Amino acid sequence: MAILNILEFPDPRLRTIAKPVEVVDDAVRQLIDDMFETMYEAPGIGLAATQVNVHKRIVVMDLSEDKSEPRVFINPEFEPLTEDMDQYQEGCLSVPGFYENVDRPQKVRIKALDRDGNPFEEVAEGLLAVCIQHECDHLNGKLFVDYLSTLKRDRIRKKLEKQHRQQA
């Protein structure tokens, strides 16, 4: 397994729309393992392949406190099941150190493939619903900062650009 480099906003590669996975093979499963290792090391609760500069529709997440519930979503899709919205304070490994409130549908139906390529479907609420929507946004080239005002988004971009310059 390997720790992968996580792209950070405003890197334009984060805006790439991911392509569907055609075949779930050993290379895809190795990527999934590397993504889990990267996510746990960061640490985070979710990671989309786009964030590690692999533009395939793959998401990993683990919402447990003790890293005991790894979940894989290949070619995930979701549909809102209610018009009711929940507001969560979201953060992101690609926007380190920033947390902002984002409104999202509170209940969604998820369709995806598991790490063996088997299709599954489930209804999600709460944190799982928020996370799958957040990670699917990544696969579509969107970040949580896109839900913020232009002023807030620009302020975050400028702070991260300054940090990147100082680290260079």
Swiss-Prot record:
CDD domains: Pep_deformylase. GO terms for biological process: co-translational protein modification; translation. The active site is at E135. Binds 1 Fe(2+) ion. It comes from the Bacteria. Its cofactor is Fe(2+). Pfam families: Pep_deformylase. InterPro entries: Peptide_deformylase, Peptide_deformylase_sf. It catalyses: N-terminal N-formyl-L-methionyl-[peptide] + H2O = N-terminal L-methionyl-[peptide] + formate. Fe cation binds at C92, H134, H138. This is Peptide deformylase.
